[in-house]
């Protein structure tokens, strides 16, 4: 039997997929260093090869694509003092894998569909996705649409979200999609060692037409592009802290009085759980500074909320001044309801 990652001999399944010992060891190490990998080429190093590529980004991406999933603490990132610490390591590994899968899909697939928020929540399969090629050029507003879709898809996969009614999920994603997108984009920018947001293709997040409307007041554009990233840089947030923070942001039970009692109860339960894990993570890094570190991380929420308000203002101003420009329905939905 052949390893589904590197095509060498494989005798067993590791992390849920047929793989060799070398790829098993690589995946174990990669769950700690996932956020540091980059590809120097077009992120297709493992699609066709005769000599095993050295690209760690594409090797890890291939591991995810064949179904490898982190399910137990094979490697101790910290000194594990009790079962809570083991649960934390497992949780972080699974959150990282989920984040990695959806980010890889975001980069490698696109769609010409124009679904609304209601369409996606009712039936995600109506979003017809196509493999991205080098010839495909994606504009900034299209990246916003795709990023919003993949954030919704990522969080719809959580079991506790699946138990919610369609009405509750609509409220939850209407409020959270932009906030999660803002935080996620800023974190990727920070990990790429840049201080300003841009699209994955390296273009300006705002078109010249948008910038032209704010040529006399560019401060709001600069805030949107740099403010959250700047705060992440200031506190030197880690990828693990980000993974827990974005879950705390998502599981906010006080976003609307229209949420059902059961939805609020579920969100409160999970928000408390993720907050407890984040505080424990801070304790593992530095016992004495844990309360301060915990508060520093949570303070990002205020900056992120302000960033979303600025973005909505710019979007609505552009729609008023250039009404003939048609954004995707999903983008309009999340702007109006945020």
UniProtKB/Swiss-Prot annotation:
Domain NR LBD residues, every copy: 98-337
Domain of life: Eukaryota
GO molecular function, one term: DNA-binding transcription factor activity
Keyword annotations of the record: DNA-binding, Metal-binding, Nucleus, Receptor, Transcription, Transcription regulation, Zinc, Zinc-finger
Function, in words: Orphan nuclear receptor.
Similarity-based family: Belongs to the nuclear hormone receptor family.
Protein name: Nuclear hormone receptor family member nhr-52
InterPro entries xref list: NHR-like_dom_sf, Nucl_hrmn_rcpt_lig-bd, Znf_hrmn_rcpt, Znf_NHR/GATA
Gene, per the UniProt record: nhr-52
Keyword Transcription regulation listed: yes
GO cellular component assignments: nucleus
Keyword Manganese part of the UniProt annotation: no
Pfam families in the cross-refs: Hormone_recep (PF00104), zf-C4 (PF00105)
Compartment(s) of residence: Nucleus
